[in-house]
Swiss-Prot record:
Pfam families: Enolase_C, Enolase_N. Its cofactor is Mg(2+). It comes from Chlamydia caviae (strain ATCC VR-813 / DSM 19441 / 03DC25 / GPIC) (Chlamydophila caviae). (2R)-2-phosphoglycerate binds at residues 165, 335, 364-365, 386. This is Enolase. Mg(2+) binds at residues 244, 283, 310. Its main location: cytoplasm. Binds a second Mg(2+) ion via substrate during catalysis. SMART domains: Enolase_C, Enolase_N. Gene3D superfamilies: Enolase-like C-terminal domain (3.20.20.120), Enolase-like, N-terminal domain (3.30.390.10). The active site is at 207 (proton donor), 335 (proton acceptor). It is found in: Cytoplasm; Secreted; Cell surface. Catalyzes the reversible conversion of 2-phosphoglycerate (2-PG) into phosphoenolpyruvate (PEP). It is essential for the degradation of carbohydrates via glycolysis.
Amino acid sequence: MLEVVISDIQAREILDSRGYPTLYVKVTTDAGTFGEACVPSGASTGIKEALELRDQDSSRFQGKGVLQAVKNVKEVLLPVLQGISIFDQILIDSIMVEADGTPNKEKLGANAILGVSLASAKAAAATLGRSFYRYLGGCFAHVLPCPMMNLINGGMHANNGLQFQEFMIRPIGATSLKEAVRMGADVFHSLKNILNEKNLATGVGDEGGFAPQLKSNSEALDLLVLAIEKAGFQPGEDISLALDCAASSFYDTKAETYDGKSYEEQVNILADLCDRYPIDSIEDGLAEEDFDGWELLTAELGESIQIVGDDLFVTNPELIADGISRGLANAVLIKPNQIGTLTETSEAIQLAHSQGYTTILSHRSGETEDTTIADLAVAFNTGQIKTGSLSRSERIAKYNRLMAIEEELGPEGLFKDSNPFSGE
């Protein structure tokens, strides 16, 4: 293979979709090729996530600046990566992890490291003249993922009184990614009309979903079912429902209760919702450290719906392995910035798949126009993706990229939902 090495790395502070700073990174090779990446940021974060380095300077951006992370890219990572083969991703990532030297990447920042990791891989793809998904996944990269579309936002993604964070639809009856996007858009507009008729707000939350003032989680689910029907689809057959409870956000660690309820009561609430609505996936139904609750939830519902761990696993291969050994959940949410390198992200996906767990590639609530996760979902054949609602251009950019990939793949492309409980 042609020997091409890293010659330069640039970084700068940009803004994400919430108006807070994040990193843009550009890696250039001695062949003149380059790759670019923008790093996302979460609002609801797991306590064991890799550290997102912020300046803590209250005089700018409420302390959320990333100038130190930018400096770390230029002054620490560039010197140790200059001259390294652009094609040796494992070496590139291991050099950065070693340069940081901490378990959670707190010295240099996972945001600095991830930006360089992704931009390096994109530069390698550009050097070979390949699409990013094809460079990473080779000839096996051909599965278009089923989207999980967040149409009603609550929790930490909206200030509207809803306890759960995401109320999603999954167009399981679609035969192509393009059709899935169209179905989602139809339901989105149907829901907007319903909200207008009920004199409910149609402003949107961080991820592009509506954020009306509602009295209960059930009311949000009722609205989704009605929107699906009014758009001309059959709930549970054409389109199913999914939840992200983000239960850690309403868990009292001292009392070990969920808004005053025990983990047994919380599991019963979720089981009741599954009986009443066509739900086939629940994410973070229990708090990340409530292992007894996770065991019960998996035992009660793990044979009938997808039980997704996000805060529970934080895309960390060690935590995923531990969770698998405990029998917790049956699916893993994959967020590259939770772990900080492309190599570790790949390891997390491969580990989950090897043990029969499904994976869902996911955005963060603070996003940019970067479409990397669309390529990653196809590259690793995850079969599912979470990238928000059918509004806000930082969300739409990912759907548009997926449709472009589907067109590029042609007959090779396969739209396939990896959730084994779809439509049950």
